Amino acid sequence: MSAMTLTNVRLGADAQALQTLYVEDGRFVTSLSTASETLDLQGKLLLPGLVETHIHLDKACIMQRCQLSEGTLAEAIAQTRAAKADFTEADVYQRGAQVLDKAITQGTTHMRTHVEIDPQIGLIGFNAVRRLQADYAWAISLEICVFPQEGLLNNPGTEGLLCEALAMGAEVLGGCPYTDADPGAQIRRLFELAVEFDRDLDFHLDFDLNPEGMTIGEVIRCTHQLGWAGRVTIGHVTKLSALPRDTLLAVAESLAEAGVQVTCLPSTDLFLTGREHFHNRPRGLAPLQHLHACGVTCSLSTNNIGNPFTPYGDASLVRQANLFANVSQLATEAELLRCLSWVSSESARLLRLPDYGLTPGCRADFIVFDAPSPAAVVAEISPPLMGYKAGRKTFERAQARLLRP
């Protein structure tokens, strides 16, 4: 049994409103039943751990193996396919561990990682990420979404491997309809498998800036038909940024009614789209602010780090929130708090985490900032000073110190 008393805790912008929180057996409690250690935060800001809803650990950190020239989605898929031919379980594990090390020290305590499944890679990536899931459970909760990056119906053998991974415990089933000759057929088949295995769904969807040819309607229809509300997420959906206001709001209301959730991946989506424009290049991001206003559960996430989909990244969700706020011209305190929620509380809602937060009964996953307010964390891209998973300290960061003459 372990217990901790957190004193002089600040939960918002009011520096005078300091609180005391109690942690016992890895959860926040109203009072302690045993002696405890005390952590005096001296007025530092405490927030619940950040939640990464969409990342690819298996293909991270491979830029040195790729030749980038066009910077398009098609090139990214092709270059990754070529690099994937040399992936080993040890290699995937080592690169995934690099990202997890960064993510943990950036304050992430829960992560959904997508893992590619196809006849070329087989279950190599999946097995490596399962090992990471076990080895890093002390600091971060990993859930695995297996998906057919290379297509499903046009890639024989893929479905059998997906089913094998699901039977082995993969928590989520993903999709990538635009890689199949018949995107709608892939969507329908994945819904059938999701029902068979009782899994949530997470699609890569509508990933360009052409408003024509959207498949979002088929996802909405299947969600209604099969009663999968709250269990379906669509990522990217950059086509939404090309819709006029009235059309967008109609789609947003349909998403909200169906219970389909949306994840925006700002770094990747900005890097890969709009290259056909020399001037007046669009800011092709899913407009979360408008979707949220219509009742859609939304999140922001990293997607890729150090590969042809996104050649950069430090696994900071705060940086992604700041990037989205900047590009989307969101700057008021309320808007910045909403951006923060899309990497924390709303992300937890999207992943259906049952015990997220800072109230009694919630898991004691939290991070500490030297920032004047939660909104300032996003505005200033503040790095967390320390983090805890289930009441156990997982990292600390030394504060910079000026050396005046």
Per-segment meaning from a language model:
Residues 1-35, 374:
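N-terminal metal-binding scaffold of metallo-dependent hydrolase/deaminase domains
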Residues 33-47:
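Active-site metal-binding motif and surrounding structural segment of the metallo-beta-lactamase
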Residues 44-66, 208-209:
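Di-metal (Zn2+ and/or Mg2+/Mn2+) metal-binding site signature of metallo-dependent hydrolases
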Residues 61-92, 164, 197, 215-233, ...:
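Active-site gating loops and adjacent loop-to-helix segments of metal-dependent hydrolytic enzymes
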Residues 63-114, 120-135, 160-167:
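Alpha-helical scaffold segments that flank or form the walls of functional sites
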Residues 124-138, 154-261, 277-300, 356:
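Histidine/acidic residue-rich metal-binding segments in metalloenzymes
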Residues 200, 221-232, 268, 272, ...:
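His/Asp/Glu-enriched, well-ordered alpha-helical/loop segment
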Residues 349, 360-405:
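C-terminal cap of metal-dependent C-N hydrolases
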